[in-house]
Amino acid sequence: CLEELQRDGRVKSSLEFLAMDPGYAPANRALIEENAALLELPLHIFETQIFGAVASVEKNPCYLCARMRRGYLYEEAKKLGCNKIALGHHFDDVIETILMGIFYGGQMQSMPPKLKSTSHPGMQLIRPLYYVHEEDIVRWKEHNGLSFLRCACRFTENCARHEEESKRYEMKKLVAQMKKTNPNADISIFRSAYNVHVDTLIEYDTKGKRYPFLERYDEK
């Protein structure tokens, strides 16, 4: 994706291909290296011991793991002279996140296409596959003979991530069911994040400040 943009020439940029080994089993590490070789990518792999660090965390170890991984990626990217990190979240991830927030979090929020780091000044996180559907990525993977890893964490079977993954899969099945009667259901969910009418909300939060409906109503 980013190589295509670079070849297009309208966006001037340089690329570094970075992957972290947080404590993978040798077979999983080899799979990443094989994928990079198939695509002829000059992949820079750096090692951490994140899996070992979160092994004893009983409550929400996946949240801690994700935070630590993000921090290590920012630090390593800065060493390479980068100011942005591109992650692989796609269209389906966005709509599943919206639905998980509604059904399991009691909140309405989406996954933004880019973020400025609050802990690493000058660094941004971008999601270039934001509009790309998962089925298209799967076809691309199969066309190129690649094999993808999921979490690959040795502790997944005993932690809350297993429940989270089942919830995400539940949302995936729900969307598939909805598309049987409304083929554009996924697009409508995605577009809902573009069409938020805050005046109709009972309460909303922006930049850490909450705005209850009654307070806004009395101001009118």
Regions found by a protein language model. Name each.
Residues 146-220:
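The feature marks non-catalytic terminal segments
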Residues 40-60, 123, 199-215:
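Mobile, glycine- and charge-enriched loop segments
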Residues 1-100, 104-108, 112, 135-143, ...:
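ATP-dependent adenylation/nucleotidyltransferase module used to activate substrates
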Residues 92-174:
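Catalytic subdomain that performs nucleotidyl-dependent activation
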Residues 64, 86, 128, 132, ...:
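A short glycine-/small-residue-rich loop at the edge of a beta-strand within enzyme catalytic domains
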